[in-house]
């Protein structure tokens, strides 16, 4: 019976969901083309060394051995292969890339997550200006409103803020990591115990409130202004304020929040981070950020970059649930009426041809599809 079973964390896609997903991918690719992004496709298989510098979070890699004895992996991420491509080909920079492809991650058992995910994304490489973040945020705003009916909230953060705050408390890297882990995992009792030794420090009141440091920008910035934060975080806060002000001016309908108590979406981010989610769906619809040091793992010279990935599968689930169900029509005809049937089909967006041998078979097919039967024979069949 195993030959009928799918591997854990995978699924077949068929019918309405498959059509919806194909449509969303076409819309995304058209949007990328309209913005001048160069399409890029990297192999499903990569050398494991491509992903060695980074811990890939709460999941493992699919590994296999190549003929040359090297360990290969099914790519768990799209950004690192793009970085590998840039370094290997010496493609001139700056460049804007757009992609759609599948990634593979072995999730924890019983997590409810799929191990195969279709992701679309943008990589803007060689751009140090904040304009790169602005373009990614614009793409996210425009695509989310075009692809699904639900309002999407964009959550902003900073990859270096938390690390710089704890570094101002202690030089002990183990202690720093323990505090950050408890903070990011929302282990409040453990976090409270870890910060207790800093009770005499001016920053202690901020530390106590830190696990709840998320919400509307105005409230968060007011709270931050009252805290004696180290100078090392001021550039991050200024950048956040600049981005929020820009978003409020250019996309006033967009709901924005700030979260400085959560871990960055990827460990290689170095600056502004952003995520988008809908109240109707579990998980983030998209996430991204700046990663100015990623290419140093493949070459000596660093390159500034901003990237973003969209979860096409989650977008498909939301879009499928929101679609209006249209009554399909099933066209029955005799072989000599083929041209007439094709002409009718061309005018009806929700019609399909019945290939049944006789009218009785067409009626059974229409009932199964819950479709209206259009009989071009007028009941005068050759059966």
Curated annotation (Swiss-Prot):
Gene3D superfamilies: Bira Bifunctional Protein, Domain 2 (3.30.930.10). One of its GO terms (molecular function) is histidine-tRNA ligase activity. GO terms for cellular component: cytoplasm. It comes from Lactiplantibacillus plantarum (strain ATCC BAA-793 / NCIMB 8826 / WCFS1) (Lactobacillus plantarum). InterPro entries: aa-tRNA-synth_II/BPL/LPL, HisRS-like_core, HisRS/HisZ, HisZ. Heteromultimer composed of HisG and HisZ subunits. Required for the first step of histidine biosynthesis. May allow the feedback regulation of ATP phosphoribosyltransferase activity by histidine. One of its GO terms (biological process) is L-histidine biosynthetic process. Belongs to the class-II aminoacyl-tRNA synthetase family. HisZ subfamily. Keywords: Amino-acid biosynthesis, Cytoplasm, Histidine biosynthesis. This function is generally fulfilled by the C-terminal part of HisG, which is missing in some bacteria such as this one. This is ATP phosphoribosyltransferase regulatory subunit.
